[in-house]
Amino acid sequence: MPKFLDALAGFAVTLGSMFKKPITEGYPEKPGPVAPRYHGRHQLNRYPDGLEKCIGCELCAWACPADAIYVEGADNTADERYSPGERYGRVYQINYLRCIGCGLCIEACPTRALTMTTEYEMADDNRADLIWGKDKLLAPLQEGMQAPPHDMAPGKTDDDYYLGNVTPITPVPSGTEDAR
């Protein structure tokens, strides 16, 4: 007798869903909401003055189980400074044909240079376009940022950058300079 009741319970679920209004998704015209912690595409972040956070340590590439990240570090010079430390990521590539979106690269990054956004539409009809370089991965320059290479903020050390003690560069409007 209990097996018969189990079958009736299954039919009740089916019968109940037959009379519900069908749910139609509006995707791609109207994409649904994305969870705040969703693992979407990667982004290389910048400091408030525009210098890159990536120091070219390659820890993200070592942590990637799919071998989807390639990093080639280089030394900063007095003439060309891209990050506050001694090194920067000269070449940075993520192969989205291999990436499994696990986020281990994010956890491995010591400077929080690499994060994941909530963007998920990265499809392309060309395989070569799914290998993203620094040009696509770097966060866009915000107001008060200067495109690298440039010197560190006056009076600041690389420790100040890592501790978050750097503010955006604010240009002085023309005509407001002191006439001394």
Curated annotation (Swiss-Prot):
Disulfide bond positions: none
Transmembrane regions listed in the UniProt entry: none
Alphabetical list of InterPro entries matching this protein: 4Fe4S_Fe-S-bd, 4Fe4S_Fe_S_CS, NADH_quinone_OxRdtase_chainI
Positions with a binding annotation for [4Fe-4S] cluster 2: 64, 99, 102, 105
GO biological process assignments: aerobic respiration
GO CC, alphabetical: plasma membrane
Topology relative to the membrane: Peripheral membrane protein
Keyword annotations of the record: 4Fe-4S, Cell membrane, Iron, Iron-sulfur, Membrane, Metal-binding, NAD, Quinone, Repeat, Translocase
Subcellular location: Cell membrane
Residue span, 4Fe-4S ferredoxin-type domain: 44-74, 90-119
Primary subcellular site in the record, as a coarse category: membrane
Needed co-factor(s): [4Fe-4S] cluster
Binding annotation for [4Fe-4S] cluster 1: 54, 57, 60, 109
Keyword Metal-binding: yes
Enzyme class (EC, first level): translocase
EC number(s) reported in the record: 7.1.1.-
Molecular functions (GO terms): 4 iron, 4 sulfur cluster binding; iron ion binding; NADH:ubiquinone reductase (non-electrogenic) activity; quinone binding
Annotated HAMAP family: NDH1_NuoI
Assembly: NDH-1 is composed of 14 different subunits. Subunits NuoA, H, J, K, L, M, N constitute the membrane sector of the complex.
General function of this protein: NDH-1 shuttles electrons from NADH, via FMN and iron-sulfur (Fe-S) centers, to quinones in the respiratory chain. The immediate electron acceptor for the enzyme in this species is believed to be menaquinone. Couples the redox reaction to proton translocation (for every two electrons transferred, four hydrogen ions are translocated across the cytoplasmic membrane), and thus conserves the redox energy in a proton gradient.
Recorded family membership: Belongs to the complex I 23 kDa subunit family.
Name assigned to this protein: NADH-quinone oxidoreductase subunit I
